[in-house]
């Protein structure tokens, strides 16, 4: 069987979506070497007047770079869609196939040769799969990861209509959490061609390290006492604007313990968070963005990791932290409760959220957490090899339809 993947992956931003998609595809390729695989990463480039206006106003422009990239032994072909005034107008039309002309002209042979299309990201990537089905008769599967369901369609009525068309005409819709699938129902999706299949964790990259290695990291970054961590983008969606309040509440609720707060990542609110934490005299270590090796080491030093997001697809970072032995306390957004799996460690949104989250963190810190047991449970239940088979099982179904 020949499988064509259409993905939303930026090699310069190897974070949640990139890694979740890559790990799943890599696991499928390993499990089913009898298949042939082609992966196309759809990216964007600003052109014409649209690009000129962005340059004049100092906004970030998207430019064409390489034609492909290889990561972790997997090759990705890159196809660029132009962003200009013409493309913006086409996007508003019901028949928007012309928006993807660059993809069809650059990938016609790949489309004709494949037996099934597996698309990772609802829009516009899933829309390409929709038109491949209409024009070439190829069946398709779409995996939805988060904001392609819980944000974009709710903010734009044109996108909403098109995402629903994508869902209704696919062989299978795969949602990374039950919550995300429920959100699709709220959107208006009524089909039964769906399943919830959580994301996994790469147990070769996330695992417990030795006490000697932990102490080395602690000493290097001046991590003292109990270490409460966060890993991810420092932005409003992750509720980063409330980090200082959460950290202060933890410190005040448990004055008998010394606390370090470790923030792994970067984002638009970093400077603001740093300033507020400094004003509150909190001991916070900001590490900046880290590759997986660095993330693993910091997670191993954490007593508890927090994930107070306002919205989330699944929350791969939860299982990664668990694989390293760290307990996690988070919000009830998206698939976070499913990833955490411990009801008491999920804090409902609402009044006093920050204080209630802090209270639960302190309770977990002062309980007897078996790091080895946490890690083993995660590795037994969230290994990518098990998760990947969920998607692969639909390939034959699609080819038969």
Named regions from a protein language model:
Residues 4, 222-238, 244-248, 262:
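Conserved donor-binding/catalytic core segment of Leloir-type glycosyltransferases
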Residues 179, 200:
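Carbohydrate-associated surface elements
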Residues 271-290:
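Nucleotide-activated donor-binding/catalytic signature segment of Leloir-type glycosyltransferases, i.e.
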Residues 289-290, 297-302:
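Short alpha-helical donor nucleotide-sugar binding micro-motif in glycosyltransferases
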Residues 310:
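Aromatic "clamp/platform" in nucleotide-sugar-dependent glycosyltransferases that forms part
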Residues 318, 327-330:
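Short hydrophobic beta-strand element within catalytic cores of glycosyltransferases
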Residues 366-398:
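A charged, aromatic-enriched C-terminal amphipathic alpha-helix characteristic of glycosyltransferases
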């Amino acid at each position: 069987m020949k499988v064509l993947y259409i993905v939303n992956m930026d090699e310069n931003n190897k974070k949640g979506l990139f890694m979740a998609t890559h790990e799943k595809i890599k696991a499928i390729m390993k499990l089913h070497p009898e298949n042939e695989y082609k992966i196309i990463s759809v990216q964007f480039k600003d052109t014409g007047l649209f690009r000129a206006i962005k340059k004049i106003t100092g906004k970030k422009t998207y430019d064409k770079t390489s034609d492909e990239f290889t990561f972790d032994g997997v090759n990705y072909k890159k196809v660029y869609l132009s962003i200009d005034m013409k493309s913006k107008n086409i996007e508003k039309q019901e028949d928007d196939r012309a928006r993807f002309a660059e993809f069809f002209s650059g990938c016609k042979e790949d489309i004709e040769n494949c037996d099934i299309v597996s698309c990772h990201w609802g829009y516009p990537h899933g829309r390409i799969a929709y038109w491949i089905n209409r024009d070439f008769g190829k069946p398709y599967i779409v995996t939805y990861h988060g904001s392609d369901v819980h944000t974009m369609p709710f903010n734009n009525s044109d996108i909403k209509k098109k995402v629903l068309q994508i869902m209704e005409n696919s062989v299978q819709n795969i949602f990374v959490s039950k919550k995300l699938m429920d959100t699709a129902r709220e959107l208006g999706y009524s089909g039964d061609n769906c399943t919830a299949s959580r994301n996994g964790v790469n147990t070769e990259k996330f695992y417990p390290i030795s006490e000697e290695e932990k102490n080395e990291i602690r000493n290097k970054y001046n991590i003292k006492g109990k270490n409460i961590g966060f890993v991810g983008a420092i932005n409003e969606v992750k509720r980063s604007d409330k980090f200082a309040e959460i950290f202060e509440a933890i410190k005040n609720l448990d004055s008998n313990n010394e606390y370090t707060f470790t923030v792994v990542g970067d984002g638009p609110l970093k400077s603001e968070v740093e300033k507020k934490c400094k004003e509150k005299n909190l001991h916070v270590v900001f590490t900046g963005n880290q590759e997986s090796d660095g993330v693993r080491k910091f997670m191993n030093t954490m007593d508890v990791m927090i994930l107070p997001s306002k919205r989330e697809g699944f929350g791969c970072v939860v299982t990664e932290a668990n694989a390293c032995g760290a307990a996690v306390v988070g919000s009830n957004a998206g698939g976070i409760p499913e990833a955490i799996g411990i009801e008491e460690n999920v804090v409902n949104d609402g009044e006093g959220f920050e204080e209630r989250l802090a209270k639960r963190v302190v309770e977990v810190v002062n309980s007897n957490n078996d790091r080895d047991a946490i890690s083993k449970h995660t590795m037994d239940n969230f290994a990518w090899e098990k998760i990947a088979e969920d998607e692969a099982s639909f390939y034959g179904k699609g080819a038969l339809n």
